[in-house]
Design a protein with these regions (language model features):
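Conserved pre-ATP/AMP-binding loop-to-beta segment of ANL
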Residues: 41-43, 157-162, 175-197, 204, ...
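Structural core segment of the AMP-binding/adenylate-forming
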Residues: 75-76, 99, 103-173, 496, ...
Length: 546
């Protein structure tokens, strides 16, 4: 039996008492995910290509391909510590690139294909990315921004010499020309692994730099919120969430491979619930991570358990609180399928959650602290611990500092603000703890919007809106939405009184989609004569919400 980070415990209480982070002295995630398993010829990835159909990849296949890509990157000058962007959807080339990076000692920068040119440029430029591997769907955006990213020397596009145009290298050609069998970088849990970008309310997105221990933290949490069912060769996992999102990349894909399980990859635009059910039926998916928005869409299909021959055992969800309506629907619709909500942050790993094997889940509750973490509810002003039932800021302390982030990239002052002097990490999330130890989410302490499982910083959306010449000022907030949890609403102060409101709404939405991401456009737009501001001219978003 291969080593895994989280042993099995009979009870939640015993796990908290006995578990400790016994991280190995040497650790390279590429080796852990691919080479440690008893049978590396077993299927690691089942990929449904929209054009060519089903492709299967064993752990050996992924090892050989990532070896070749690592050799090709090294041949082009990529070295340990260099940042390499990954702008690829749920395709094999996504994890192959991450694995190749770590074999070289390079640092991955996961980015979603949903990003527009401004969002991509900011992140590639801020991370000082030397190279980027991209899907053809973002070709135009990359071509537009390449000259504005001074450190970006290498662009590799998925495809072969017949399909890749411009100055980009063809992914398929590089792999065919390279030789496998490179010397894997001697890494430890402290070796830098990735820079992930998170949105904030008071500034541009921040790069969150993690070390390799990140993936062990994600794997431990996943073992618990997937109800200890990650058995090698038995469990098959799928998520509709983009593999650029931490809970999908680390908490599903790489967590599955740490445990020797199979993952389904399926790059699709949008989410169709009937297609999702059919996919889970075709691949005998046992375990799925579903953001709440996806679950609400699945509810629209009548009698799915009768219409589809499903193998589902466990559902997990995160990104926003689940309503009792969704939880009740799962319990009533699927026989013996557990649904476990969990909570985490890009910076802090996945730290709180439900596990039906251990304790009764409470609809809407974040759950209880996972083994390896202590939590407190603090007074936001005094930082003193609050009693049961009182709302305060959630603070978390890991049993091993390394499973949390190392720093905000290039922002030491922001890094210092995230942690107290005695080692507690602050979340900016307001919660309370009940008498039974369950934690309940109340709201963000800042203005970040939770929409369809994504965290959206209002400032970035406001700046995109202001690129429209007819927008004088803009304020962005989240408003309740039955499907998305929250929807983005923009209050726009037009530059003149002479404007066509329908046309301007359409143009603003298209502008934000193009510059940022599909999920960041304002669903609702209201035009106002004047926006509420502070004495220093800052938008008072709280007034807009009221």
């Amino acid at each position: 039996m291969s080593w895994t980070v989280m042993p099995t415990f009979e009870t939640h209480e015993r796990a908290h008492e006995e578990f400790s982070w016994e991280l190995p002295d040497e650790f390279n995630p590429a080796v852990d995910f691919l080479r440690k398993h008893d049978d590396t010829s077993r299927t690691a990835l089942r990929y449904e290509d929209p054009d060519s159909g089903l492709e299967t990849y064993s752990f050996d296949d992924l090892d050989e391909r990532s070896d070749r890509l690592a050799a090709a990157l090294a041949d082009r000058g990529v070295e340990a510590g260099d940042r390499v962007g990954v702008v690829v959807p749920q395709k094999p080339q996504n994890p192959i690139t991450h694995l190749a990076n770590w074999k070289l000692g390079a640092v991955s920068v996961p980015l979603t294909v949903l990003f527009g040119r401004d969002a991509l440029q900011y992140r590639l430029e801020d991370s000082d990315a030397t190279a980027v591997v991209v899907d053809p769907s973002v070709r135009e955006a990359i071509e537009e921004i390449r000259d504005d990213c001074p450190s970006l020397e290498i662009v590799i596009e998925l495809g072969d010499a017949d399909t890749v145009t411009g100055d980009a290298d063809a992914f398929d050609e590089l792999l065919a020309a390279a030789e496998p069998g490179i010397d894997v970088y001697d890494a430890t849990p402290e070796t830098p692994t990735a820079i992930m970008y998170t949105s904030g309310s008071t500034g541009p997105p921040k790069g969150v730099r993690h070390s390799h221990a990140l993936w062990l933290g994600r794997a431990a949490a996943a073992y618990n919120y997937f109800d200890h069912g990650l058995e090698p060769g038995a469990a098959t996992l799928w998520t509709p969430a983009d593999w650029a999102w931490g809970a999908a990349l680390g908490g599903t894909l790489f967590a599955a491979w740490h445990h020797g399980c199979t993952v389904v990859g399926w790059p699709r635009d949008g989410f169709d619930p009937e297609d999702a059910y059919a996919l889970m039926e075709r691949h005998d998916v046992t375990t799925a991570f579903m953001p709440p928005t996806a679950l609400r869409l699945l509810m629209a299909v009548d009698d799915p358990e009768q219409a589809y021959d499903l193998s589902l055992e466990t559902l997990a969800s995160a990104g926003e609180p689940l309503t009792s309506e969704v939880v009740d629907w799962v319990e009533e619709t699927f026989a013996d399928v557990a649904i476990n909500e969990f909570y985490g942050q890009t910076e802090l790993n996945l730290v709180v959650g439900n596990s039906a094997n251990w304790f009764e889940t409470q609809p809407g509750s974040m759950g209880k602290p996972f083994p390896g973490y202590e939590v407190r509810v603090l007074d936001p002003e005094t930082r003193t611990e609050l009693p049961t039932g009182e709302v305060g800021e959630l603070a978390v302390k890991p049993g091993d500092r390394r499973v949390f982030f190392d720093e905000y990239w290039k922002r030491p002052e922001k890094t210092a603000e995230k942690r107290t002097d005695d080692g507690w990490f602050l979340t900016d999330d307001l919660v309370y703890r009940d008498d039974d130890g369950y934690l309940w989410f109340v709201s963000r302490a800042d203005d970040v919007i939770l929409t369809s499982g994504y965290r959206v910083g209002p400032m970035e959306v406001e700046e995109a809106i202001l690129h429209h010449p007819e927008a004088e000022q803009a304020g962005v907030v989240g408003v309740p939405d039955e499907t998305r949890g929250e929807a983005i609403k923009a209050y726009v102060q037009p530059a003149t009184d002479d404007y066509d409101s329908d046309r301007l709404r359409t143009e603003i939405r298209e502008l934000v989609r193009d510059r940022l991401a599909e999920y960041e456009y304002p669903k609702h737009i209201a035009f106002v004569d004047e926006l509420p501001t502070t004495s220093t001219g800052k938008i008072q978003r709280r007034s807009l919400r009221e």
